[in-house]
Structures are given as C-alpha cells and as structure tokens.
C-alpha cells in the first residue's frame, strides 16, 4: 500500500521596514492576515501564515523590518524577532524595493550571508520604477551580491509574479508531515488578530507621529448569544496629545477607526462583531521591557 508523500517547510519573509513584506504574505496566502500600511514598522510580531495546497504546506513567517536604529526597547525586540526568524527556516524570501538599495538592505543581506537557508530575492514594487532602463543594471548589481536561489521582480500590490515565488517555494519544501490542519491560515488567536486589525486602522488614519507610540490591548473578547463576538479594545498611547489625536474632533477619528476595524473583523471571523474602543495614556510603554512583555511583544522570542 503506497502512502502519499507530503511536503512542509518554514519560509521567512525578511527585509528592511516598509518594502512590502506583509503585502507579499497576504498575496501568497490569498487573504489578509498581516497588517499593512504605508508607514514603516507596521509589523511588530512574527506572524505565521499557512498556505496548504494538496500535498504542500508552506508556513510563512512575516518578520518585523530589520533596521539599524535600536534606541528604544521595542526596536531592539523587533530586530531580535526578525533575526531569530532567519535561523530556523528552510527558505528565505528577501524583499527589496525597486531600484533602491540602502544601508538597512545591506545589513539584512549580511545577516542572510551568515545563514544556511537558500534565499529568493523578491524585487518588489517594480511597477513603480519610473526609469525602466535602470531596472536591469540594478538586478545585475543585486545578483552580484550573493548567490541567490532566484531573483524575481514582483509587485506584491498587484500580484505580478507572486505565483512565481509560490512555485519556487513549493519546489523547495522538504518532504515532511504537515504541521497544521489544512484549513488553518494562521497560528495566531482571534484576539491577537483583532488587536492587529485595530492597530492597522490607527496607522492608516493617523499622522506620521504615531506608529511607535500606539499599541492595542484586547481587554474582552467573548462570544455572545447572537453568534457574534463582543470585543473591547484599549488603545495605549504615550502622551495626552496623542490621545486627543486618536479620539479626533468630537470623537470622529476613533469612530472611523472602529467602523473600519469592525468591517475587517467581521470578514475575518465570519461573524457579527460588536466593538468598543477606549484610549488610555501609558507613558513610556515602548521603552519598558516589562510593559512590552505584558503586551505580548516578547512572547514569541
């Protein structure tokens, strides 16, 4: 009697902040589990996204962007989370942006050179490159930097060549039993995903000052008798001025954030959601390792 073979492996998606790692993960999975915004440092935790197709299960780790600035405790922890993801995977997808190459890209590359896993280079946002003639010389420059498994120009936003990345991943998955049931798309809890959705809306609707200074704690997440979820979210900021910014004029901003977050939650959880949001000042949380631990920033290191 023949036993069907199965293939399974872990793939880290790495790169400097804001190159499109989370957008690529969402496209590879065919749905949204990692939060995205135009602001750098949107991803603060390692998100595991799972894509199962027949005998093949690819388990993607979406890391925080690696960067050289480590002044605050939260930045140091994010770098640690990203670095530790590189060490224990079968494959790495290194995401860079168009024809840009920065010291942070160089730093990520140096970390990858130290590792053993083969690396696919995904050159993202190629649709945004104004001077198309610059693209080929830049790809040749990148090819000279390391012995990449493959170099694929992509647009994570439009999906251009994302199927090529998925095919390369599938080809390099080792023979192994699947780690997760086939209907799983993430190993994160609904409570965690609710906090990430609220944080994404905060990033999307607030000014450039806020990304580092805001986080979300889910204080209550219960099923109700109507088959839906009652969720209470606490938004923590560092200063009184930021609290006013989050609430907005006559509460307009927090209302918009709540409406948009609720829509995404209902789509993700496939159930009606009753969401209530509060804002609280907790000064210095991003510098305080104990506070970060209590907010879940250290549990996956």
Curated annotation (Swiss-Prot):
It is found in: Cytoplasm; Cell inner membrane. Residues 62-65 are annotated as: G3. InterPro entries: G_ERA_dom (IPR030388), GTP-bd (IPR006073), GTPase_Era-like (IPR005662), KH_dom-like_a/b (IPR015946), KH_dom_type_2 (IPR004044), KH_sf_prok-type (IPR009019), P-loop_NTPase (IPR027417), Small_GTP-bd (IPR005225). GTP binds at residues 15-22, 62-66, 124-127. It holds the Pfam family MMR_HSR1. It is a peripheral membrane protein. Its main location: cytoplasm. Residues 15-22 are annotated as: G1. SUPFAM superfamilies: P-loop containing nucleoside triphosphate hydrolases (SSF52540), Prokaryotic type KH domain (KH-domain type II) (SSF54814). It comes from the Bacteria. Belongs to the TRAFAC class TrmE-Era-EngA-EngB-Septin-like GTPase superfamily. Era GTPase family. Monomer. An essential GTPase that binds both GDP and GTP, with rapid nucleotide exchange. Plays a role in 16S rRNA processing and 30S ribosomal subunit biogenesis and possibly also in cell cycle regulation and energy metabolism. HAMAP family: GTPase_Era. This is GTPase Era.
């Amino acid at each position: 009697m023949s036993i069907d073979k199965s293939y399974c492996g872990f793939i880290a998606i790495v790169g400097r902040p804001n190159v499109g790692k989370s957008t690529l993960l969402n496209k590879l999975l065919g749905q949204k589990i990692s939060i995205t915004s135009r602001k750098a440092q949107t991803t603060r935790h390692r998100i595991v996204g799972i894509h199962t197709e027949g005998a093949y299960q690819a388990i993607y780790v979406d890391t925080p962007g690696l960067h050289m600035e480590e002044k605050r405790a939260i930045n140091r922890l994010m770098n640690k989370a990203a670095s530790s993801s590189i060490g224990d995977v079968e494959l790495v997808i290194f995401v860079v942006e168009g024809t840009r190459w920065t010291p942070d890209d160089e730093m990520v590359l140096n970390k990858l050179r130290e590792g053993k896993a083969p690396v696919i280079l995904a050159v993202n946002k190629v649709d945004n490159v104004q001077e198309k003639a610059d693209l080929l010389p830049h790809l040749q420059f990148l090819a000279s930097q390391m012995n990449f498994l493959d170099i694929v120009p992509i647009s994570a936003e439009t999906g251009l060549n994302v199927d090529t990345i998925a095919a390369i991943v599938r080809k390099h998955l080792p023979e192994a039993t699947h780690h997760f049931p086939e209907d799983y798309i993430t190993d994160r809890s609904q409570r965690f995903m609710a906090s990430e959705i609220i944080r994404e809306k905060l990033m999307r609707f607030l000014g450039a000052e806020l990304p580092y200074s805001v986080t979300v704690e889910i204080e209550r997440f219960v099923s109700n008798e109507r088959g839906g979820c009652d969720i209470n979210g606490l938004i923590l900021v560092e200063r009184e001025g930021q609290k006013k910014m989050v609430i907005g004029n006559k509460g307009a901003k927090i209302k918009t954030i709540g409406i948009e977050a609720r829509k995404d939650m209902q789509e993700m959880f496939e159930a009606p959601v009753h969401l209530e949001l509060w804002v609280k000042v907790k000064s210095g949380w991003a510098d305080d390792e104990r506070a970060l631990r209590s907010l879940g920033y250290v549990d996956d290191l």
